[in-house]
Amino acid sequence: MNAKVEVGQPAANSFFAANLADADPEIAKAIELELGRQRHEIELIASENIVSKAVLEAQGSIMTNKYAEGYPGKRYYGGCQFVDIAENLAIERVRKLFDCQFANVQPNSGSQANQAVFLALLQPGDVFMGLDLAAGGHLTHGSPVNLSGKWFKAVSYGVRQSDHLIDMDAVEALAKEHKPKLIIAGGSAYPRHWDFARFRAIADSVGAYFFVDMAHFAGLVAGGAHPSPFPHAHVVTSTTHKTLRGPRGGLVLTNDADIAKKINSAVFPGLQGGPLMHVIAAKAVAFGEALRPDFRLYAQQVVVNAGTLASRLVEKGFAISSGGTDNHLMLVDLRPKQLTGKAAEAALGRASITCNKNGVPFDTASPFVTSGIRLGSPAATSRGFGTKEFQDVADLIAETLDGLAKNGEEGNAAVEASVKERAIALTQRFPIY
């Protein structure tokens, strides 16, 4: 005879009440260690930022429990009236933020937002143009290892060897030769402004859509510290983290009603099923934050700080690709120092300064080694770093890398330890969480 097992109230209470440290101490420990890293390292990865406590609360909310296939007012599940509020707020706020007519806030990432544009506007085998990954573009802009380069015919444009700037005459010549259906402006490591008006004129001349991927500089656009892709672009995508300082995710914007309809169908049901409503709620919070006056000050300071970091590094004898930066990021070419990006990233990491190895224009080193590093100002600016702090950061970077060049990895421990002590002291003046 089988004993009857009843689910008792104490067990249910335990499920809903147990905190993470009790329920899963291993994950809790990993989070604790990561918090310590974020608190005590100077974060210079250009694609990273630090979100507000409010964004964290929204993303960790009970909105994660709700399935909501479809769009506000047109869901395939019941009980969506409150998640509809969150998504409608996200749409309303992001439209206001970028002064555009239509927005889809459901993409789970910038890559999926870009895929939605391809699905909406292209057919397999169609030709499109984007910045070469080796010149600062992005995987999703036609890299042969990415879906965009496998399903479509990608024609890449590059930068001039003389100044590492995009040669718009060369872009125009390529467009006239290949007759693309779509032209992309945007990248992951291009430190200068984009000539949106010229790109649109070139696109119009060959009957192409003009698509801007502003994942890296969206927050700067929102804060009035970078030219807007509107009214030039037919369609715009972005991530919601990076300079926009929200949760990890994507979005698509347009002023064209027909394109908006195609984008909505491409996102759902074309690419995704149920949207992540807890993330969309967090996006709404971040968009609301970005509409406030203090975000404009933040965006402007991001640009000032990046310029300060770049100019100080030049003073210290480092080569900066294109000679500087107009936005939040820069590429440091380490070939004159006879260093690799891989070695520099590791040395700076040991000194409590986080960055990423990155190829530089016309790099001959492998992507796993590289001849440069990419640096960005958004996260440290969120902490409160100003121009003086970024001058200090540049000095710490120079001291570490000059020591590495002189002493080698095995002989640079004392320099790295000294820099680490000062880097941690700097972070402690600007605490997070």
From Swiss-Prot:
> Which Pfam families does the entry mention?
SHMT (PF00464)
Site positions (Plays an important role in substrate specificity) are: 241
Pathway info: One-carbon metabolism; tetrahydrofolate interconversion; Amino-acid biosynthesis; glycine biosynthesis; glycine from L-serine: step 1/1
Q: Name one GO cellular component term.
A: cytosol
Q: Output the Gene Ontology terms for molecular function.
A: glycine hydroxymethyltransferase activity; pyridoxal phosphate binding
Co-factor(s): pyridoxal 5'-phosphate
Tell me, what does this protein do in biology? Catalyzes the reversible interconversion of serine and glycine with tetrahydrofolate (THF) serving as the one-carbon carrier. This reaction serves as the major source of one-carbon groups required for the biosynthesis of purines, thymidylate, methionine, and other important biomolecules. Also exhibits THF-independent aldolase activity toward beta-hydroxyamino acids, producing glycine and aldehydes, via a retro-aldol mechanism.
Q: Subunit arrangement?
A: Homodimer.
Q: Mind telling me what this protein is named?
A: Serine hydroxymethyltransferase
- Source organism per UniProt: Beijerinckia indica subsp. indica (strain ATCC 9039 / DSM 1715 / NCIMB 8712)
